[in-house]
Amino acid sequence: MQPLQLGLLDGQQLVEFLLLFLVVLNMGIRYLSHRRHQRQAEEGGPDAITRFLALEVSTVVLVLVAFVYMTIHYHGGMIISILAITVLISDFFEFEARKVEARNELPLESPRAAIGASFVLLAYVSYVALFFLVEPFWSAVV
């Protein structure tokens, strides 16, 4: 018998809502991170721009909770994990792009790739977590 053969036994229903909360929290922290990067670029130039620890931590926690969700629902967990990893990778490259923009004295653009990936992740996690709201209508049609 494997340790995770039975999956997560306690709090299975809470993981979906935890994912939804983490995605929304991550998007809010991304907004604060972008404002902080703009302020750092104005005050100290390109060398003053540093990673926002809260964004990094929230993204890693989001990926880890997505992996936990994969032990409960393989298909949905795999999709959410791939999307969360996409957000993590895009955050890494968006930070580097902000530093390049600051070095070239260009205005800092919003992190479009990370925002786009976050909205796709938000749409899927909302579908998974809030499906009970549309289930009666869905069952009538399908």
What is the role of each PLM region?
Residues 66-96:
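Short alpha-helical packing/oligomerization segments
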Residues 15-36:
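N-terminal signal-anchor/start-transfer transmembrane helix
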Residues 95-113:
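Membrane-helix boundary connector in multi-pass membrane proteins
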Residues 54-68, 116-128:
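Core segments of transmembrane alpha-helices
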Residues 36-50:
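Short juxtamembrane and helix-loop transition motifs at transmembrane-helix boundaries
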Residues 126-142:
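Juxtamembrane boundary at the C-terminal end of a transmembrane helix
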Residues 1-11, 140-142:
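Short, strongly hydrophobic alpha-helical membrane anchors
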Residues 15-18, 22, 51-54, 58, ...:
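Physicochemical signature of membrane-embedded alpha-helices that form the seven-helix bundle of GPCRs
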